[in-house]
Structures are given as C-alpha cells and as structure tokens.
Amino acid sequence: MLKYSFRALCAAGLMLMASALAAQDSPSKEFAIVDLSANMIREVPDYAGELGDQALMGTVVEILERKGYWVKIRTPEPYVGWVNEMGLAVRSPEEIDRWLSSPRYICTALLTRIYEEPSVSSAFISDLVLGDILLKVLKANGEPLAKKGFLAVETPSGKKGFVRKDELLDFRAWADERLRTQESDPERFRSDLIRTAACFNGVPYMWGGTSTKNVDCSGLSRTVFFANGILLPRNASQQIHTGEDITIPCEGELADYSVLQKGDLIFWGRKATEDKPEKATHVGICIGGGRFIHSSQLVRINDASTYSRIPLRGRRIVGQVDKKGSGIISVRRSPWYFKQ
C-alpha cells in the first residue's frame, strides 16, 4: 500500500470519509485536535446556538473560520459547526502527521477520568468518554509507562496524567481487531454492536448529543458503530444512504421486521411524495427478536410489534464497510485517525 502524509491526503483530495469528504490544497489550511472529552459543536458561534454534534477528544478536525473565540471546524463525518477555541489543540499538518503515527490509546470505558497521579483519590485533569483518544506516555525503552494499575497518558494539548489500565486499549491494535472481526466473523461483530448499544440504555436524549453523556437518535447509532471501529455519517438523513438497502414489508399499520438482522439500522420519517422527497427523521438499531434500541426521550428498547410508527426502510452496515459507494469507512482505514 502506498504511504501518504496527512498533508498529501488533503492536497490530493483523498480524505476517505463516510460521505467522501475531499479537502483542497491550500497553504493556509489549519488543523486541530479536539482536547475536550466531548466538545460541543454549535450551529452558530454562540453558546445559545443550537447544538448540532459533539467531537471526541483526539479527533482531528479542519479549521475553516474564526470569529472571536469561536472556531468553525469540519469533523471526519463530516460535520461543520462552531466550537470554543479552548476545546482545540491547533496543530500544523506536520504535527497532525506525527499525531496520526504516534502510539495512542482509545478509551473503552463509558465514562472515566484522567488523574494527576496513579490513584482515584488524586485530583483529576479531565473526564473521558467512550472513544476518546490519548497519546501514550512511553518509558526510555519504548514501553508504555504504567504505575499501580494505571497507564500514563497525554492529552492533545500536552497535559499528562493517569487512567486506569482496564479502561484503555492500544488504539491501533483495537482498530485492527475491530476491522478483522467485522470482516471475518460478522455474527460476532453484530453481537458486539448490540452489547455496546445496550450500555447506552437509560442515557438521556439530547439533540446533537454524540457521546456516552447524552445522545440523540443518530448520535446513538453513530457512537455505537464508532465504538466498534466504523465511521457513520452524523445524521439519520445521511445514514439512510449508507450500506445496503433493506426493504421492510408493510401491510397497513403493520411492519414485518423479521427481514432485519442484529445491527441493521431502521429508519422512520416522511415517505416520498410527488412534491417532496423521502426524509429520514429517526433511526434505531435492530437488536433481534423483533426489538430495536433507539434514543427517544432517553435510550430505550422497544418491541417493534407495539411501536406505532411505520418504518421507511432498513440499512445493513455490517459487511458493507470500506466498500466502494457504501458511504462507510472503517476507523482503521480512515486518514483522519491513522496515517495511511
């Protein structure tokens, strides 16, 4: 496989995203790494502005514009919105290359903290959520620095601390394993998706939420799949165009969900008419047995037979990742997460 730097990928328009994001060559192009556990992305540069998305710590973003202490960014999904400048570590393309090549950890706990010392009784530096990415702190011999059941870490902005060892995995090894399982053992991978989704049960709904703190409907599907090494677009209206289309037979007010497999996405919304196109406004994840999990007021499980809304269609993600035209890319093969 040819090796490309992050700068070269930007210049050549080879940023392989879920929606085929391409960046144009520009000597003034700026990048940053998210430095908060779940950075709030707003539609306008104002704290009163609508929340549109969240970006997780360690995620590389492109800087598009500045207005006061607000910065307009583009995320890997891609999603464009405004964040506070203090939630970013601004870096040159060369520094981004080094970040993408450096040994890193991914947080596998739903919620945890970075501590100043290897002890839960010490002061904490930052909170963490599932999917946050941190630099490894290494000893002189290149081995990870570990103390008393904790691993030493560094945030994108350079703050150092400790996280419990059982709450982190090597990022590259994790991404390799997720990709390998998805390709070689899809049934196990589907079960992994459902186990991850079940961890969100009871999490409050929040419009724009895309973390274990709060999620909206598409934020749940996006976060569950990311936690298993797959990048989905941000919104339901985009996710409905990814993967393989699955027609859900409907007769009157009854829908036959038996055509779906675990891990398939189910979409509801406005059916196409002569005047208006189809529009997905809600999404859930099939968990088998005629049930699905979704975020509606809070994350919960519903039985399809008692759910009154008629679905638009299903989409099969597993087995379609990294395929041309699928609109889906694995974390391991994304140049926003690893130097390819």
Where are these regions (language model features)?
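Aromatic- and glycine-rich peptidoglycan recognition patches
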Residues: 112, 119-124, 179, 254, ...
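Second-shell loop/turn segments in exported
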Residues: 121, 178-184, 204-212
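Bacterial N-terminal signal peptides that target proteins for export
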Residues: 1-10
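Boundary regions of SH3-family modules and the immediately adjacent low-complexity/disordered segments
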Residues: 24-29, 59-62, 75-106, 119, ...
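Catalytic cysteine-centered active-site loop
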Residues: 205-219, 223-260
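Beta-loop motif signature
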Residues: 34-63, 107-142, 205
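Conserved "cap/hinge" positions at secondary-structure junctions
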Residues: 65, 138, 269-270, 296
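N-terminal signal peptide c-region/cleavage motif recognized by signal peptidases
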Residues: 17-20
